[in-house]
Regions:
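Conserved small/polar residues in nucleotide/adenosyl-binding loops
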Residues: 119-125
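Alpha/beta enzyme core
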Residues: 70-85
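Glycine-rich, proline-tolerant flexible connector loops at the mouths of alpha/beta enzymes
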Residues: 61-63, 86-103
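Alpha-helix-loop-beta-strand connector modules within alpha/beta enzyme cores
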Residues: 99-115
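Short hydrophobic transmembrane-like helices used for membrane targeting/insertion
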Residues: 128-129
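Hydrophobic faces of well-ordered beta-strands that scaffold small-molecule active sites
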Residues: 52-54, 87, 114-117
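An N-cap/entry alpha-helix motif that binds or orients negatively charged groups
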Residues: 2-67
């Protein structure tokens, strides 16, 4: 089994677990509430000579641990000071060691729009919030 097969397998397990916790209707309601974030993100990167979207992640399947002393709050503040126009937070638990808590913590300390990155492997809409 290669790494992509492993990621897909683990993600399917997590999606099936999530289905028993939150209904698709609840997710859709949350997405409707968050629609203003999409336009905020678009406005922040549109019509910019240089619009950097900085990524925050603790690990990756290929590099394993990227930062032993991972401090996403400090990293977000540094990126914002350096001119990033948006942040991409990896929240995937198993291979990127992210979490929704990291996303929530970073959102409290920055004014930048933050899209949630399940982009490395998104399965059903259930996992996109």
């Amino acid at each position: 089994m290669n790494i992509l097969d492993e990621i897909v397998s683990k993600k399917r397990t997590r999606v099936n677990e999530a289905k028993s916790i939150v209904s698709i209707e609840d997710i859709q309601n949350q997405l409707e509430k968050l629609s203003s974030l999409k336009s905020n993100f678009k406005n922040n990167i549109e019509n910019q000579a240089q619009a950097i979207i900085a990524e925050i992640k603790k690990a990756s399947p290929s590099a394993v641990i990227i930062a032993e002393d991972f401090n996403p709050i400090l990293k977000a503040q540094e990126y914002e000071k350096m001119g990033a126009r948006a942040l991409s937070i990896l929240t995937e638990e198993d291979f990127f060691q992210g979490s929704n808590k990291v996303l929530q913590d970073v959102k409290k300390v920055t004014n930048l729009p933050i899209p949630v990155s399940y982009t490395h492997l998104t399965l059903p809409t259930k996992r996109i919030v």
